[in-house]
Amino acid sequence: MLKTISPLISPTLLKVLAEMGHGDEIIFSDAHFPAHSLGPQVIRADGLSVSDLLRAIIPLFELDSYAPPLVMMAAVEGDTLDPSVEARYRDALSLEAPCPDIVRIDRYAFYERAQKAFAIVITGECAKYGNILLKKGVTP
């Protein structure tokens, strides 16, 4: 048993977070994201929300300070975003320090980043456009 590590973080996720180097990226995706067809390592976190997992990992995870560390998918033309999704994620990520800005990129650019990601964590999140990419930084 390890102390102070959230029980929401599976042993597999903990191992992946430890193996990532600075500049590596991880995606916390909604339940509908095509993770398995994109290529990188996939970790299942069924039944958990993205915001709960972000809240659990942020004490262990240094965000990049040299490049935008947070990326979300922009709405497809003609579609809308629910601003409460980003607000929940920002609240979860600001537990340790102020949350950096979240950059929005189009769907296909996000998929390209996902193909190069270190890992994708599929959650039980059902919010539309509920995917977020985190870029790991250097620990101080």
Swiss-Prot record:
Catalytic activity reported: alpha-L-fucose = beta-L-fucose
Keyword terms of this UniProt record: Carbohydrate metabolism, Cytoplasm, Fucose metabolism, Isomerase
Catalytic-site annotation from UniProt: 22
Binding residues for substrate: 30, 107, 129-131
EC numbers, comma separated: 5.1.3.29
One cellular component (GO) term of this entry: cytoplasm
Keyword Calcium: no
Domain of life: Bacteria
Location(s), subcellular: Cytoplasm
GO molecular function: fucose binding; L-fucose mutarotase activity
Pathway: Carbohydrate metabolism; L-fucose metabolism
SUPFAM superfamilies cross-referenced by the UniProt entry: RbsD-like
GO biological process: fucosylation; L-fucose metabolic process
Gene3D superfamilies referenced in this protein's UniProt entry, alphabetically: RbsD-like domain
Keyword Isomerase: yes
Subunit relationships: Homodecamer.
Family designation: Belongs to the RbsD / FucU family. FucU mutarotase subfamily.
Function: Involved in the anomeric conversion of L-fucose.
Name the record gives this protein: L-fucose mutarotase
Natural source organism: Salmonella paratyphi B (strain ATCC BAA-1250 / SPB7)
Gene responsible for this protein: fucU
